[in-house]
């Protein structure tokens, strides 16, 4: 709530790589990042979405199209796809606020925007009338599958309305989890859905970039459920590899 209540100022050191923001220092729920680093903002590397608000230490940065696609910092929110154009209008000293919306609302806004572009007629959307308090009370986890004797824990988190982050296991470095991520990526490449745009693996995670207007989240989640049921036990996993001979 502190993040969404604050009025942020655009830092002078901003570009297409990222828009730095000046505002209140966050109160962290932990003292450090565990295995990932000394600062509480540190996590094991996972993929970033364009428009993600990335806390590099205590300063948030809105990652732009020329920003990193992978990194080791926490990201509490992501600018929705329909509002990405606004990032290009910001300049040093501008003030802004973030307003949380549901995935369904984000898709409605994107669909309305597409209709506006094609019909050249404008329909206004009142963000403040969309139930902000209700959104803040929702968990950022849309699905969690507990670990069993043959499977790892899986957590699904949206990153904005066009990206889905899939995380395996606990927050530890484990080559088994990396293998599981790679196996899922290979399965999705073999069984691709129309609307999946890009797959970006991390250490223990995989981010799926998809077109929400062509591929609803519910359909993507059903596809991922099928993937988990078809993937082999990680102990029996066999992945292609290669030998490189150096001169």
PLM features: residue spans?
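Glycine-rich active-site loops that engage anionic ligands at enzyme catalytic sites
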Residues: 1-247
